[in-house]
């Protein structure tokens, strides 16, 4: 498992045979998410049946999660990176996002022409009239619409660009495949959420282990065995490469295939060691360990939460710092957001009539610094960023697309006062958050007192059926859309991965005949600089496009790009000959 897999002649292996008919098309940005664990006290049902694994290279379906914990999380910027999501600035050295492609080959595009025509009728019209600066739709991009922009300032091979971040374009932005790793063998749909980059290793969760791989070769450097399956991982990492995970109390058995996710562990990713592991009990659970859903990190505080309770620990030793207070009016900490600060979604009231409060917390004591009461009609809320404090919610369940976002709330973390509420029409913007999870937003970034969002895909200006989108921003003080606009380019779509100082690192998802690209968007001018352009030969394209953006993690750091899955399942018999990947990496010279 640890050794890199050498591709046969022609790259990643022979392409899969053509399907007998058009595969089910992949949902666009904002399509309803797969069912996740009921959150915030919802009654637990029977474990869902695992989905059938689609054939390799086909659009992926929507797998249900494994019961007992939430769906894969995405992250904020940390030293040497973490996956896609609401990346807020952190210390420099540091998320599962986009819609996935509907079509992987030109033949599938033609087969789906009828659907595409329907989309074209309304596509691409809304944006021209919705821009906050009133400028025409064509303005404000250095990428143009060709999808062929070079590294550097709109032009020649990586020179120029912004000084607002650490990521610089190499002399040659064309990448080569670094390594690829096969998925672990499983018999059920299984979470493998979590990946990080240190100065020496790419670290990825397995099923019951955490593995460090050589950054360039993919050879196994170390492995941390665990008592049970990994069920969640922090998106944050300390300066010395320490982080936290959740894992189950035991490995699954025939008699008990689903174990409780009740163990918190501290990891040292520099040495490949499990520093500590702990379970806790709550006053309402008797002697039973609390089942956790999510875990986060702020400074040296690990905070884990779930429907049954929560706790905070010291990152280095695992010593318990505090537990949330359980009140007589049925209030509890639903989950935490970490990063530069620590915040909580605290829930009171009944399931049918909840009242949510957002609190900035002292990470060491758990004491509230400030509180903001969310408006009526908000059943769940997601913490997008903790400093500045930004929260997303689907107010009155008006989003209607499964994105769980109708509005963003910019809150003063010191006073708890609302700065501004930003309406984010789900039909226009493609960010998304978990349906019940607190720290699971993706496809957006926060920095420069702005929130950066991808627009929904719409009709391009070139050949028939081409699709594209943009990245735009809103001011977190005024709530107004700014003049920022970065075009993905004809037939490409793009979404933010993280902040890099004042710049935005974004991934440009490729069309069926090109490789993907990593770009740096200047935070001041919004000019794009290509940092990496992936190979366009079919075998590599098929491997890159096999990762659906909503269920994958994307890490870019200093000329290395890693794409990994957050969910795996047993392959279908018909797809046993198809190449499957847990991780694919690219690098520039």
Give the location of each predicted region.
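Intrinsically disordered, low-complexity Pro/Gly-rich regions
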Residues: 1-106
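Blade-level signature of beta-propeller repeat domains, shared across WD40, Kelch, NHL, RCC1
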Residues: 542-589
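Repeated scaffold domains used in trafficking and secretory/extracellular systems
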Residues: 186-195, 227-241, 280-295, 327-340, ...
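Acidic, serine/threonine- and glycine-rich low-complexity intrinsically disordered segments
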Residues: 322-462, 468-470, 474-475
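Structural motif
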Residues: 209-211, 252-264, 308-311, 352-359, ...
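Loop/turn-rich, solvent-exposed surfaces of beta-rich toroidal or solenoidal domains
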Residues: 435-473, 482-527
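Blade-loop segments of beta-propeller domains
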Residues: 220-263, 282
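Aromatic (tryptophan-biased) beta-strands that constitute blades/sheets of beta-rich domains
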Residues: 106-107, 129, 135-201, 205-232, ...
């Amino acid at each position: 498992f640890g050794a890199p897999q050498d591709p046969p002649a022609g790259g990643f292996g022979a392409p899969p045979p053509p399907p007998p008919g058009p595969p089910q098309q992949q949902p666009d940005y904002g399509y309803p998410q797969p069912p996740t664990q009921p959150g915030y006290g919802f009654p637990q049902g029977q474990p869902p049946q695992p989905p059938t694994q689609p054939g390799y290279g086909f659009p992926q379906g929507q797998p249900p999660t494994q019961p007992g914990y939430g769906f894969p999380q995405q992250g904020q910027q940390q030293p040497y990176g973490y996956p896609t999501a609401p990346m807020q600035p952190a210390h420099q050295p540091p998320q599962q996002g986009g819609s996935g492609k509907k079509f992987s080959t030109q033949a599938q595009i033609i087969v789906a022409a009828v659907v595409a025509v329907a989309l074209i009728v309304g596509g691409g019209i809304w944006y021209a009239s919705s821009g906050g600066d009133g400028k025409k739709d064509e303005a404000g991009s250095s990428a143009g619409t060709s999808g062929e922009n070079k590294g550097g300032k709109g032009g020649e091979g990586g020179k120029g660009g912004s000084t607002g971040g650490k990521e610089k374009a190499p002399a040659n932005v064309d990448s080569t495949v670094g390594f690829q790793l096969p998925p672990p063998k499983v018999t059920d749909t299984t979470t493998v959420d979590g990946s990080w980059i240190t100065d020496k290793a790419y670290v990825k969760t397995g099923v019951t282990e955490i593995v460090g791989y050589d950054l360039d070769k993919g050879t196994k450097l170390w492995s941390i065995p665990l008592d049970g399956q990994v069920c969640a991982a922090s998106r944050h990492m300390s300066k010395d490469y320490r982080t936290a995970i959740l894992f189950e109390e035991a490995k699954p058995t025939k008699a008990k295939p689903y174990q409780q996710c009740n163990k918190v562990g501290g990891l040292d990713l520099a040495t490949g060691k499990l520093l500590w592991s702990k379970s806790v009990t709550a006053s309402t659970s008797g002697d039973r360990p609390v089942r956790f859903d999510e875990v986060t990190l702020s400074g040296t505080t690990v905070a884990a939460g779930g429907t049954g309770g929560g706790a905070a620990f010291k990152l280095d030793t695992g010593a318990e710092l505090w537990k949330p207070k359980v009140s007589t009016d049925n209030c509890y900490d639903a989950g935490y957001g970490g990063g530069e600060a620590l915040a909580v979604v605290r829930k009171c009231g009944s399931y049918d009539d909840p009242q949510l409060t957002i609190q900035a917390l002292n990470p060491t004591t758990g004491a509230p610094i400030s509180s903001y009461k969310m408006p009526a009609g908000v059943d769940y809320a997601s913490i997008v960023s903790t400093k500045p404090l930004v929260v997303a919610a689907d107010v009155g369940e008006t989003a209607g697309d499964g994105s769980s976002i109708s509005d963003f709330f910019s809150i003063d973390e010191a006073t708890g006062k609302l700065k501004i509420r930003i309406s984010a029409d789900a039909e226009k913007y493609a960010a998304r958050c978990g349906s019940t999870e607190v720290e699971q937003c993706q496809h957006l970034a926060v920095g420069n007192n702005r929130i950066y969002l991808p627009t929904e895909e719409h009709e391009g200006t070139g050949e028939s059926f081409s699709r594209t989108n943009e990245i735009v921003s809103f001011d977190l003080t005024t709530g107004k859309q700014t003049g920022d606009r970065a075009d993905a380019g004809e037939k490409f779509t793009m979404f933010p991965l993280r902040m890099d100082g004042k710049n935005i690192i974004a991934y440009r998802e490729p069309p069926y005949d090109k490789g993907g690209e990593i770009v740096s968007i200047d935070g001041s001018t919004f000019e794009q600089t290509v940092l990496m352009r992936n190979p366009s030969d079919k075998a590599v394209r098929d491997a890159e496009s096999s990762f659906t953006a909503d269920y994958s993690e994307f890490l870019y750091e200093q000329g290395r790009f890693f794409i990994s899955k957050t969910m795996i399942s047993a392959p279908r018999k018909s797809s046993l000959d198809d190449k499957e990947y847990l991780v694919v990496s690219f690098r520039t010279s």
